[in-house]
Amino acid sequence: MVSEAPPFWWTKADWRAYALWPFSWLYGRIAGMRMDRARRATSAVPLICIGNFTVGGAGKTPTAIAIARAAKARGLKPAFLSRGYGGSLDVTTLVDPEHHRARDVGDEPLLLAREALTVICRRRVDGARKLAAEGADIIIMDDGFQSARLVFDFALIVVDSGRGIGNGHLVPSGPVRAPIGNQLRHATALLKLGHGSAADPVVRRASRAGKPVYVAETVRIDEGSLVGVKVLAWAGIADTEKFFKTVRETGAIIEETRSFPDHHHFSEDEIADLIDRATSRGYTLVTTAKDIVRLEPGHGRAGELAAKSRVIEIEVRFDDPAAPGKIIDAALASARARRLREHKSG
């Protein structure tokens, strides 16, 4: 999978997209067949997949956290399953946020592990077994929708309303991971994140296919005002411009920005440059929670950068407060029906 999306993926299709179309056609055929024909294993406990149609971020991790919090409010014991992208460990691992580093397990699993039991595993089937053995009542899988390894009891596809599905073309012409028709066949519902219009075409297509569409937005959890504060905003996430927009919405004055690739591990020079530029100019450093967890205390000046940076925390809030509960109920009902079918066929 492509790790960094080129900018032309997110604009109207141009000659570059069309020049790569033959490769996209082949990629789409393979990806679509894999989704439709692969033999999928079943989980011993209900499994919700939080996925997206495209390469890059769409808000899956904060959405997964919102669903987990709703599950805990219902007295369930949710757990997260992640591939651990960006981490070096290639064995099934129960993530310990006090012990593991982003280099070990990836940045997103560290955020998830602060909320609930989290396992990373290259083979998601093994990860699901591990979580069931650990006593999870419901598994929330962050990403992995196109992997075709597990049966989903509910597949919620997150679409960023500001980006939609980009130019609508398949990798490598565009950001789409598999033909939308194939993906919709395996989706249970869509979540439109935000109130922009870029996602509307795919949302309408999903509605015509009979898929429920939920709406939510990311909201800031403010810990003190940034109004009028001059800042240097830095981030290494899939959509840094979206983060910079969020910073502006706090009332902060962005004097400088620094963008890094998603899941980027910062070098000593990069860390020093951020600290020194902000200090010399009197700017406040601001970043994301996902970036902070990639800074390793005791590793050069990383701890200093973490201490000097204000984190803009966000969470996902559904327009319908009952929506997360409905998703959980549907997943539990689907799992019961699945187990009944398995019992009858066994």
UniProtKB/Swiss-Prot annotation:
GO biological process: lipid A biosynthetic process; lipopolysaccharide core region biosynthetic process
Highest taxon, organism lineage: Bacteria
GO cellular component: plasma membrane
SUPFAM superfamilies (UniProt xref): P-loop containing nucleoside triphosphate hydrolases (SSF52540)
Catalysed reaction, written as an equation: a lipid A disaccharide + ATP = a lipid IVA + ADP + H(+)
UniProt entry tagged with the keyword Plastid: no
Annotated ATP binding sites: T54, V55, G56, G57, A58, G59, K60, T61
NCBIfam families given in the database record: lpxK (TIGR00682)
Any GO MF annotation of the entry: ATP binding
Functional description taken from the UniProt entry: Transfers the gamma-phosphate of ATP to the 4'-position of a tetraacyldisaccharide 1-phosphate intermediate (termed DS-1-P) to form tetraacyldisaccharide 1,4'-bis-phosphate (lipid IVA).
HAMAP family assigned: LpxK
InterPro entries referenced in this protein's UniProt entry, alphabetically: LpxK (IPR003758), P-loop_NTPase (IPR027417)
Protein name: Tetraacyldisaccharide 4'-kinase
The protein's Enzyme Commission number: 2.7.1.130
Family: Belongs to the LpxK family.
Keyword ATP-binding included in the entry's annotation: yes
Pathway noted in the entry: Glycolipid biosynthesis; lipid IV(A) biosynthesis; lipid IV(A) from (3R)-3-hydroxytetradecanoyl-[acyl-carrier-protein] and UDP-N-acetyl-alpha-D-glucosamine: step 6/6
Keywords, ordered alphabetically: ATP-binding, Kinase, Lipid A biosynthesis, Lipid biosynthesis, Lipid metabolism, Nucleotide-binding, Transferase
